[in-house]
């Protein structure tokens, strides 16, 4: 189980990313349209003034049961060992153990 502070920090980053997503996207589009270098530098300054945690690259996918940040399966939103336990207990419909 991940510490609660780490999970809350990740939720805070998600909120910030959603809040500044449109500003970040419009600034990046504006950079590609502006021909002069001095205007581009001004827009880069605006991008740098945004909070660091609002960048989408700072987000991590976490297991929604344990909060584990590694070995997550996107389809289920679970970490590998929790996914395995749930499949063995037949708690995930449509997921079967492989046998050959």
Curated annotation (Swiss-Prot):
Keywords: Chloroplast, Plastid, Ribonucleoprotein, Ribosomal protein, RNA-binding, rRNA-binding
GO molecular function, one term: rRNA binding
Subcellular location: Plastid, Chloroplast
Alphabetized Pfam families for the sequence: Ribosomal_S14 (PF00253)
Main location: plastid
InterPro entries according to UniProt: Ribosomal_uS14, Ribosomal_uS14_bac/plastid, Ribosomal_uS14_CS
A biological-process GO annotation: translation
Residue ranges, annotated region (Disordered): 1-31
Role summary: Binds 16S rRNA, required for the assembly of 30S particles.
NCBIfam families in UniProt: PRK08881.1
Similarity-based family: Belongs to the universal ribosomal protein uS14 family.
Subunit structure: Part of the 30S ribosomal subunit.
Name this protein carries in UniProt: Small ribosomal subunit protein uS14c
Source organism per UniProt: Solanum tuberosum
Gene name for this UniProt entry: rps14
């Amino acid at each position: 189980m991940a510490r609660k502070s780490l999970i809350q920090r990740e939720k805070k980053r998600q909120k910030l990313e959603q809040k500044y997503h449109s500003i970040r996207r419009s600034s990046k589009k504006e950079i590609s349209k502006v021909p002069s270098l001095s205007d581009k530098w001004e827009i880069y300054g605006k991008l740098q003034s945004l909070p660091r945690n609002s960048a989408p690259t700072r987000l991590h996918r976490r297991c929604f049961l344990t909060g584990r940040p590694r070995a997550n399966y996107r389809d289920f939103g679970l970490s590998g060992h929790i996914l395995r336990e749930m499949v063995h207990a037949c708690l995930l419909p449509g997921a079967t153990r492989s046998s050959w």
